[in-house]
Every structure is written in C-alpha cells, then in structure tokens.
Amino acid sequence: MFSGRREFVRLTYASEFEELYLSRMRHYRLGGKTYCFRIGLVNVTNIANFCTLISSLLLVISMETNHDITELVFIIDRSGSMSGLESDTIGGFNSVISKQKKEKGRTIVSTVLFSTELETVHDRVDIGGVKKMTEKQYCVGGCTALLDAVGITVDRIRRRQENDDEKVKTTLVVIITDGCENSSQEYTYANVKNLIDRQKENGWDFLFLGSNIDVAKEACRMGIGRENSVDYCCDSEGVRGMYCTVDAKLSRARKKGSFSPDE
C-alpha cells in the first residue's frame, strides 16, 4: 500500500479470523516524513469495521502530512555585466537561504541562474537540503535572456505544482537582474505578462529587483506591480543591501502570504 526503503506496509483482511493484521514493523516515506507501524493485531468484527479502520488510518496520515508548504523561486541574473560582483551575489544569496532556513514551516526552493542560457541550481529542494551557491555555479558571462528565464521557470514550476500530490500554499518568486532584456528567443513581454497574471490569480506573488533600468516600468511590462519592484545600485554595497531587502521581504511575505506592503 505504501512503499519505502524496498519494504511495504501490508494491510490484510482475513475474513476467516475476522482480524486485521499489520505486518512487522516497517518504516516508509510519505510527504518527506518517516512513519512507522508496529507489529500488532487489531480485531474487527466485519468488513464495515475494517473499512472504518482504514479510513481512520488514512485520515491520520493525511493530517500528519498536510503541512503549509511555501515555495521560494529565485531567478538570478549572471550575465557578463555582473562581473566583479560574484562574491557579493554568492554571499548575499547564501545569507538569504541561511536565514530562511530558520523560518517556521516547510519550504522548498528552486534557483535558476540566467544569462544567454538558463541553469537550474536547485530544483524544488527542501530548504534544509539546499547547499551553498559556489563560484563554480555563479560564473558570469553572456547576455540577458530575462524573459526566457522568467517564462520558462514559472511555467515549469506551475506544471510541477499541478502534478504534485501535496499542494503548495504560498509561492513567492524573486527575480533579480542588472539590465534590460536583450537575448530571449522563446518568450515576449506579452507572453510573460499573461503567464504571471494567471499565476497571480492562483495566489502566487512576485518581487522584481533591478539595476540600471527603469525598474517599475520593467516590472509592469511583465505584470508585476510597482509596489513589488525594487531599484538597487549595481555595486558591491548595493548588491549586499539588495539581498538584505530580499530576506526581509521574504520573511514578511511568508507570514502574510504575499509581498504586498502593509496597509
């Protein structure tokens, strides 16, 4: 019925003995959590009682695994114009993850780095298992395929969530760039805006941080409100400060469910 570690929990109704047997103690994984059934016998007098018992068992499992899941999605520019800011970017991102690990509730993380092409560094990983970003991973170069990065990533996460047994309660997408779109091949502003608008209707929220561009205008073109856009200075101090802003906004948004400013 449930599997894990190449072992099974077996539920058997033996009508001739009118008893429910649970197999020897087994551990299994469900929803990222380990469960254990002990050896034992549970007497049932008829098939109706058996069904009631199974329903109760499934209800307990459902309650145990129905956690509020937060999904954090980072889409980070590593084009050539970020040269010289690698250590600040790496340090800032790692600091955000370290602090977010201390927040309550289950969290999964996706991190996509983009220039002319995209690279997925973390693919919906439980935050406790997210390793620090390294210089090898954040190696700058190339152009800025911002629209492709956002469109491809948002659509991929959307599809994954739709096929998940466990439902994500809050999805927060953080987009960081230091320049204008200049090399996307698949997505246009209209495509991205339509995609973001649909996901906002599904409860997602987006934060756009940019430098050397009209940040509010760029955000609006993609369907992200001005109130969720942040301008930062593209130097060492500015990048560090920007990641402090990201951490603060994420912590607040996780409690509220969105990046929207306080009333």
Report residues per predicted region.
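Acidic, low-complexity intrinsically disordered regions
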Residues: 4, 30, 41-46, 50, ...
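Aromatic (phenylalanine/tyrosine) cluster motif
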Residues: 2, 8, 13, 17, ...
